[in-house]
Amino acid sequence: MFDLIIRGGAVYDGTGRPARWADVAVSGGKIAAVEPLPQAQAARVIDARGKWVTPGFIDIHRHADAAVFRPGFGELELRQGLTTIVSGNCGLSCAPVGPENLPAILSYLEPICGRVPPEAAQETLAGYFAAQPAAPLHTGMLVGAGTVRASAAGYQVQRLEPAHYAAIHRRLEQALADGALGVSLGLGYAPECFYTTHELIRALAPLAGQSIPITVHMRQEGGGVVTAAQEMVEVARALKAPVHISHLKAMGRDNWRGKVPQVLALLDRARQEGLDLSCDVYPYTAGSTQLLHILPPEFLAGGMEAIVRRLGDPDQRRQLARRIESGDGFDDIARLAGWDGIFLTSLHCPEDHPYQGMSLARIAALTGQDPLTCCCDLLVRERGEITMIDFMADEEDIAAILRDPFSNLISDSTYPTEGQPHPRVYGTFVHLLTRFVLQRGDLTPELSLIHISEPTRHLRIS
């Protein structure tokens, strides 16, 4: 007598082997048998005829650092088949954070992680794990190197002093000892966008030769994506450490169907050299992050208060307009996606709520402003805490990445406290199976399930 039998489904084991028709018996919360069990009985029987039975889905790239503290967390994730998630991505973990720059860090995190409760903003990851409520699925954390740098040195552009590096090293080592699964970088975000490659390698010195996974939101994902990937090869070579590129894409129509194949070929050559490089991708042509991400690096210096002051200055706005017009040296999302391709999904001020879900082009037309002025006014009024969805990627590039054997699927889900989230929060895995398996045929069912049930190989967890 079993507790549960899932009867008659097509059972995929997630290794790439073809499905087999079988029953799955469960006792005591563990799988007891996978075979035809026509005579077996159970307290509960699920009829899976005509359905797939798969391992639990794993998402190694979410931003649920603060969301795990919300009541009812986990239902949304379980209902889409997730049994394991990893947060702390893109350098933006909500711990460890010291008291020195705490308000600035939490303000910067809010559009992506949502409002961070005091019990989550711990000085150590051990404290974070101890405070975290029980969840109905497995949760893991990366330590965000951006948060670590901001804790040690704030959001300033200036060159770091030896004492800053020492503080960064201590925090990284402590977080890894506390149970971090690896280190995440956010080179497209402040303050890590201020690193040179040499400085970045110096900051990550404790990882040298340690086989500790490094995941990275690269410095650029548009016209400069190949150069950014070359930088990651250099980091992997210098540190002799595994590097995993997060949400690989080529933003902007001019970069589609050319840059991604170049990056994949670059990574393949690096692996032939003996380096450990991999990547992941989400299955949507639209991304989602903080609206501040449209700004060039120099406009992100000093933290949120400085950013807001800068955007309120007419001279600074004129300089910003020139920078966006030229697009040099940063991911110019205003040009890559277009003002009509940037939609605002999380706004806090009551007067701005009617604009939620609208494009910046549409809001500008309604307010009688040019899009950049409209954008700056909103960022000032909302104190920078706006989440956007931006349409900038290509489905053929996504398919090419999915076909690469060293890639896996992620959602890159953000969890703003209010607003309209990107559908990837709840639809990523269904979208992969329906769009790229059943409709387009880019992947077989067997290969698709490797992408979503075995991505932990890139983080060395099982």
Give, region by region, the residue ranges found by the protein language model.
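Histidine-rich, glycine-flanked metal-binding segment
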Residues: M1-G56
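Active-site neighborhoods of metal-dependent hydrolases
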Residues: Y128-P162, I168-Y189, R237, A241-P242, ...
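Histidine-centered divalent metal-coordination motifs
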Residues: H61-D65, H217, H451
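Divalent metal-binding pocket/active-site signature
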Residues: Q174-E234
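Single conserved hydrophobic/aromatic residue that forms the stacking wall/gate
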Residues: I450-S462
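Metal-associated gating/positioning segment near the N- to mid-region
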Residues: A40, A48-E119
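C-terminal amphipathic alpha-helical interaction region
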Residues: L443-L447
